Regions:
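STAS-like cytosolic regulatory interaction modules
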Residues: 1-52, 64-106
Length: 106
Protein backbone atom coordinates (compact mmCIF):
# COMPACT_ATOMS: atom_id res chain seq x y z
CA UNK A 1 0.00 0.00 0.00
CA UNK A 2 1.15 3.50 -0.79
CA UNK A 3 0.62 6.47 1.56
CA UNK A 4 0.90 10.01 0.22
CA UNK A 5 0.66 12.96 2.62
CA UNK A 6 0.55 16.72 2.32
CA UNK A 7 -0.07 19.41 4.94
CA UNK A 8 -1.98 22.55 4.03
CA UNK A 9 -2.88 25.21 6.62
CA UNK A 10 -3.34 22.85 9.55
CA UNK A 11 -4.95 20.06 7.53
CA UNK A 12 -3.01 16.87 6.93
CA UNK A 13 -4.27 15.22 3.74
CA UNK A 14 -3.46 11.51 3.47
CA UNK A 15 -4.16 9.50 0.32
CA UNK A 16 -4.12 5.72 0.55
CA UNK A 17 -3.55 3.64 -2.57
CA UNK A 18 -3.67 -0.13 -3.05
CA UNK A 19 -4.98 -2.78 -0.67
CA UNK A 20 -5.70 -1.93 2.97
CA UNK A 21 -5.63 -5.37 4.56
CA UNK A 22 -4.18 -6.83 7.77
CA UNK A 23 -0.56 -6.59 6.62
CA UNK A 24 -0.83 -3.06 5.23
CA UNK A 25 -2.88 -1.71 8.15
CA UNK A 26 -0.22 -2.45 10.74
CA UNK A 27 2.47 -0.41 8.97
CA UNK A 28 -0.05 2.27 7.95
CA UNK A 29 -1.09 2.80 11.58
CA UNK A 30 2.56 3.35 12.57
CA UNK A 31 3.33 5.64 9.63
CA UNK A 32 0.19 7.75 9.94
CA UNK A 33 0.62 7.97 13.72
CA UNK A 34 4.14 9.27 13.14
CA UNK A 35 2.88 11.88 10.67
CA UNK A 36 0.28 13.07 13.17
CA UNK A 37 2.87 13.27 15.96
CA UNK A 38 5.19 15.39 13.79
CA UNK A 39 2.61 17.61 12.05
CA UNK A 40 0.10 18.04 14.93
CA UNK A 41 -2.73 18.85 12.50
CA UNK A 42 -6.07 20.47 13.34
CA UNK A 43 -7.69 18.02 10.95
CA UNK A 44 -6.86 14.96 8.87
CA UNK A 45 -8.54 14.13 5.58
CA UNK A 46 -8.19 10.55 4.40
CA UNK A 47 -8.64 10.17 0.64
CA UNK A 48 -9.52 6.58 -0.21
CA UNK A 49 -9.93 7.08 -3.97
CA UNK A 50 -6.89 4.90 -4.72
CA UNK A 51 -7.97 1.98 -2.51
CA UNK A 52 -8.57 -1.18 -4.50
CA UNK A 53 -9.58 -3.22 -1.41
CA UNK A 54 -10.26 -2.66 2.28
CA UNK A 55 -11.21 -5.20 4.94
CA UNK A 56 -11.96 -4.74 8.64
CA UNK A 57 -8.29 -3.94 9.27
CA UNK A 58 -9.03 -0.60 7.64
CA UNK A 59 -11.51 0.06 10.45
CA UNK A 60 -8.67 -0.41 12.95
CA UNK A 61 -6.62 2.22 11.10
CA UNK A 62 -9.53 4.66 11.10
CA UNK A 63 -10.38 4.15 14.79
CA UNK A 64 -6.73 4.42 15.83
CA UNK A 65 -6.37 7.67 13.88
CA UNK A 66 -9.70 9.00 15.20
CA UNK A 67 -8.67 8.38 18.83
CA UNK A 68 -5.23 9.95 18.35
CA UNK A 69 -6.81 13.03 16.78
CA UNK A 70 -9.35 13.27 19.62
CA UNK A 71 -6.40 13.61 22.01
CA UNK A 72 -5.32 16.64 19.96
CA UNK A 73 -8.89 18.01 19.66
CA UNK A 74 -8.54 17.50 15.90
CA UNK A 75 -11.06 16.20 13.38
CA UNK A 76 -11.05 13.32 10.89
CA UNK A 77 -12.83 13.26 7.52
CA UNK A 78 -12.86 10.44 4.97
CA UNK A 79 -13.45 11.30 1.30
CA UNK A 80 -13.66 9.59 -2.10
CA UNK A 81 -14.50 6.19 -0.63
CA UNK A 82 -14.90 3.49 -3.32
CA UNK A 83 -18.04 1.29 -3.17
CA UNK A 84 -16.37 -1.80 -1.66
CA UNK A 85 -14.68 0.20 1.11
CA UNK A 86 -17.88 2.18 1.72
CA UNK A 87 -19.74 -1.06 2.42
CA UNK A 88 -17.14 -1.96 5.07
CA UNK A 89 -17.36 1.51 6.67
CA UNK A 90 -21.16 1.46 6.59
CA UNK A 91 -21.36 -2.04 8.13
CA UNK A 92 -19.12 -0.88 10.99
CA UNK A 93 -21.08 2.35 11.52
CA UNK A 94 -18.03 4.52 10.83
CA UNK A 95 -20.06 6.90 8.68
CA UNK A 96 -22.19 7.71 11.75
CA UNK A 97 -19.23 9.01 13.77
CA UNK A 98 -16.86 10.33 11.09
CA UNK A 99 -17.89 12.44 8.08
CA UNK A 100 -17.57 10.09 5.10
CA UNK A 101 -18.10 10.86 1.41
CA UNK A 102 -18.45 8.24 -1.30
CA UNK A 103 -16.35 8.44 -4.45
CA UNK A 104 -18.16 10.33 -7.17
CA UNK A 105 -19.47 8.27 -10.05
CA UNK A 106 -17.97 9.26 -13.39
Amino acid sequence: MRIISMKDEGTLRIALEGELDHHAARSAIARIGGLIDVELPRSVVFNFKGLSFMDSSGIALIIHTYRRLAELSAKLVIEDVPPQAYKVLNAAGINKMIPTARASVR
